[in-house]
Amino acid sequence: MAAGGPGAGSAAPVSSTSSLPLAALNMRVRRRLSLFLNVRTQVAADWTALAEEMDFEYLEIRQLETHADPTGRLLDAWQGRPGASVGRLLELLTKLGRDDVLLELGPSIEEDCQKYILKQQQEEAEKPLQVAAVDSSVPRTAELAGITTLDDPLGHMPERFDAFICYCPSDIQFVQEMIRQLEQTNYRLKLCVSDRDVLPGTCVWSIASELIEKRCRRMVVVVSDDYLQSKECDFQTKFALSLSPGAHQKRLIPIKYKAMKKEFPSILRFITVCDYTNPCTKSWFWTRLAKALSLP
């Protein structure tokens, strides 16, 4: 599946990886795709042309236009449809004459595909030998399929995020402001907000573990007095810390967005805090947070 331009064949992923689901592409590649396709020009096909090739209807495309990152939303929506794959995406980009995209992103797409294959092989190798008929001690993989609004119900193409947001219901207004500042601006980050993105009907502990460990690159903790009383937030925080002891991978980012009467949680004191309450640094708050969440 080579592009038409000179040298494009070496940039596009090889056929052995192009049949992979779109979930193989990480957020970095998706954001760079958005940089190419979100721009409306007269000389190059943009995301709307891609949406039409993906068989999206007029009203669906108009709805996607309302998002700050229509290309990102398009990919999220398309990956749950039959026939969506890395290879099909490259075919459509070639058909639209976007050889520039293939040349620029081909190596990164190939790298993502190879990482996806390696991870699948590792997970398969680590599976314990168990008899399905009698094994009831661990949850089935299918139980964690279709847990978010844009998930493939069969679990083949799970929805992925830049960050999981750990918060209490009483802090939802600040979370909504976070959505406006990080998703609906040029940062174009994708946040996992339970009340918005998670479907009801599954064990909250299983969902949180799946999302934090496998679907989200980082976790933002909205710290408040109410947070200290939440067993769910306590579990999510400790689980995230267990995945990155000593915070060496910068996986967890605490946020203090209002004054607290109670003492700041001791398990988070060794991690640099984003302090929204400090008037001297408030103007830098969203930029610092966005850059922290955008790190590879």
Curated annotation (Swiss-Prot):
Domain Death: 32-109
Cross-referenced InterPro entries: DEATH-like_dom_sf, Death_dom, MyD88_Death, Myelin_different_resp_MyD88, TIR_dom, Toll_tir_struct_dom_sf
Predominant location: cytoplasm
Modification after translation, per record: Ubiquitinated; undergoes 'Lys-63'-linked polyubiquitination. OTUD4 specifically hydrolyzes 'Lys-63'-linked polyubiquitinated MYD88. Deubiquitinated by USP3 that cleaves 'Lys-63'-linked ubiquitin chains leading to inhibition of MYD88-induced NF-kappa-B signaling.
GO terms under cellular component: cytoplasm; nucleus; plasma membrane
Pfam families hit by this protein: Death, TIR_2
GO molecular-function term, one example from the UniProt record: Toll-like receptor binding
Cell location: Cytoplasm; Nucleus
Region (Intermediate domain) location: 110-155
Function: Adapter protein involved in the Toll-like receptor and IL-1 receptor signaling pathway in the innate immune response. Acts via IRAK1, IRAK2, IRF7 and TRAF6, leading to NF-kappa-B activation, cytokine secretion and the inflammatory response. Increases IL-8 transcription. Involved in IL-18-mediated signaling pathway. Activates IRF1 resulting in its rapid migration into the nucleus to mediate an efficient induction of IFN-beta, NOS2/INOS, and IL12A genes.
Domain notes: The intermediate domain (ID) is required for the phosphorylation and activation of IRAK.
Official protein name in the record: Myeloid differentiation primary response protein MyD88
Organism expressing this protein natively: Gorilla gorilla gorilla
